[in-house]
């Protein structure tokens, strides 16, 4: 049995890989969700308010509208839709120039979800036939292209051209999770998957925690909102170059790694792909009828619906209900994500330690994690629904931090379950799960269109209550059917398991050669003496 090589080590190659995946996930998430805060800067709220008043009143009398920029966080603000005299409608305007109503905004937000819905299922075939590393790189290139041309499309061709471009971005998004899941599945043993996934998905929170203040600052500067798109594209291009020269889909293909780590991964993760495995059919019927898989599948739907709602619409809530200015909006959007990051990583490391020490089984670990996320989030949403308005925005921030901290354990719950049920079918199961997740994301704008007409506090209260009930429902289902164990239908036959053992051959110069069979051809990976690096 190979001795464990620590994950958190300067020469840990799998740590380097998951950090690269995390930064890449930050880039794709930021290019997708920064539009939420940027939209509040792009849109002329005053013009929209006037337009709505004319439609409602049937005339052009717009004297009933009061424009404000923000409220003083240290004092009672103007709550609801009426100002102090009870007559004028209060509108917070960030000085945008585009007149896009709520329907047009929701259509734009839904574009990426429509695109990803098209590609997420076919992604598994691409990943099985091509390197996940290259597939991910092409996907990010599509993100970059759409991001940098968006300002031109918005100002010259209108909202529908932006919607079409966002569909193009979504075509790339459909590959992001399946490719990263495949790479992480190749690099990490089951005892480290919760930690690895916690690190990888940090990119999501960093995109909001670091990205939101940056977007707010750029929007408020002379550069204006178009610069946010250009900055996002430039940063993603830098990551893409780094990824091309340093990343690998599989440990056996790495040219630079310590001998100790490679032996550890060969013994605990790396599996040879034999001819008998190449022709083995994927058990779709067993996958789609597995209670454990279906349990995490519905979680994927609801969690993505919730996350999309808060990623896209939280800046609107801060603007419409709490009446925050653009800088305060960016700050309030960022802070809960910082709590999420810290709690997620600490929880992921802690839960893996409990599994490693046999205190918790894999199944108990994912159920405890998911239970904390679901019921903790539900409780926080009830507090937000009944105890927060623009007179106490700081209280609202505290409740959001509580909710985001709770949601940090989702990764150690249903997401870890997905990668544990049948590791050899990770690409297929990830694609199916992401297809359902994309339906959840696509559902979000439709749900918001139904419940959010004018952006009133009452409308947001109903949204929070509905999300709270959905959290309870989804969490209860996972507690009944969820699992973190390898499923019986996914176990490899004994004779194949014996063939999984790697054959090491020592040659006279001290170099150790590992014979590794790839999906397409025979390949060899070279290792050097202990405590040295391969170049």
Swiss-Prot record:
Name of the protein in its database record: Uncharacterized transporter slc-17.3
InterPro entries found in the cross-reference section: MFS, MFS_dom, MFS_Na/Anion_cotransporter, MFS_trans_sf
Annotated Gene3D superfamilies: MFS general substrate transporter like domains
GO biological process: sodium ion transport
Membrane topology qualifier: Multi-pass membrane protein
GO molecular function: symporter activity; transmembrane transporter activity
A GO cellular-component term linked to this record: membrane
Source species of the chain: Caenorhabditis elegans
PANTHER family xrefs: PROTEIN CBG12249 (PTHR11662:SF405), SOLUTE CARRIER FAMILY 17 (PTHR11662)
Location, primary (coarse class): membrane
The family this protein is said to belong to: Belongs to the major facilitator superfamily. Sodium/anion cotransporter family.
Keywords of this entry: Glycoprotein, Ion transport, Membrane, Sodium, Sodium transport, Symport, Transmembrane, Transmembrane helix, Transport
Recorded superkingdom: Eukaryota
Annotated compartments: Membrane
């Amino acid at each position: 049995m190979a001795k464990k090589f620590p994950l958190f080590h300067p020469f840990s190659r799998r740590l380097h890989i998951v950090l690269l995946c995390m930064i890449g996930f930050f880039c794709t998430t930021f290019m997708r969700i920064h539009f939420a805060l940027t939209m509040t800067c792009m849109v002329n709220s005053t013009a929209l308010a006037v337009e709505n008043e004319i439609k409602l009143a049937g005339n052009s009398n717009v004297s009933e509208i009061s424009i404000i920029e923000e409220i003083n966080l240290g004092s009672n603000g103007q709550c609801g839709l009426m100002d102090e005299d009870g007559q004028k409608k209060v509108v917070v305007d960030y000085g945008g120039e585009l007149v896009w109503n709520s329907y047009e905004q929701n259509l734009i937000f839904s574009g990426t979800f429509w695109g990803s819905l098209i590609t997420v299922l076919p992604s598994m075939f691409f990943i099985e036939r091509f390197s996940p590393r290259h597939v991910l790189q092409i996907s990010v290139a599509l993100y970059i292209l759409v991001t940098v041309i968006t300002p031109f499309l918005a100002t010259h061709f209108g909202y529908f051209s932006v919607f079409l471009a966002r569909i193009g971005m979504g075509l790339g998004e459909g590959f992001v999770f399946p490719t990263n899941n495949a790479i992480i599945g190749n690099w990490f043993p089951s005892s480290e998957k919760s930690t690895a996934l916690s690190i990888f998905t940090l990119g999501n929170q960093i995109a909001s925690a670091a990205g939101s203040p940056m977007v707010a600052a750029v929007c408020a500067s002379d550069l204006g909102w178009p610069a946010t798109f250009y900055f996002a594209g430039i940063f993603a291009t830098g990551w893409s170059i780094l990824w091309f020269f340093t990343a690998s889909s599989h440990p056996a293909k790495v040219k630079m790694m310590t001998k100790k780590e490679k032996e550890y991964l060969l013994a605990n993760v790396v599996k040879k792909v034999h001819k008998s495995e190449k022709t083995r059919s994927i058990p779709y019927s067993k996958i789609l009828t597995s209670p454990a898989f279906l349990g995490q599948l519905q979680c994927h739907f609801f969690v993505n619906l919730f996350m999309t709602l808060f990623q896209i619409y939280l800046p609107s809530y801060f603007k419409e209900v709490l009446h925050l200015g653009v800088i305060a909006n960016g700050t309030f959007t960022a802070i809960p994500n910082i709590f999420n990051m810290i709690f997620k990583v600490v929880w992921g490391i802690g839960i893996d330690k409990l599994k490693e020490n046999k205190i918790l089984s894999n199944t108990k670990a994912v159920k405890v994690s998911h239970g904390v996320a679901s019921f903790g989030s539900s409780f926080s949403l009830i507090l937000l629904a009944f105890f927060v308005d623009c007179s106490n925005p700081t209280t609202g921030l505290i409740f959001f931090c509580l909710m985001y901290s709770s949601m940090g354990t989702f990764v150690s719950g249903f997401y870890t379950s997905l990668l544990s049920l049948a590791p050899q079918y990770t690409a297929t199961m990830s694609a199916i799960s992401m297809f359902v997740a994309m339906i959840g994301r696509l559902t979000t704008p439709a749900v918001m269109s139904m419940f959010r007409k004018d952006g009133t506090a009452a409308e947001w209260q109903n949204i929070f209550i509905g999300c709270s009930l959905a959290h309870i429902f989804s969490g209860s289902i996972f507690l009944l059917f969820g699992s973190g164990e390898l499923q019986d239908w996914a176990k490899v036959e004994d004779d194949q398991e014996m063939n999984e053992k790697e054959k090491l051959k020592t040659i006279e110069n001290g170099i150790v050669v590992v014979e590794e069979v790839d999906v397409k051809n025979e390949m060899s990976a070279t290792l050097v003496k202990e405590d040295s690096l391969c170049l």
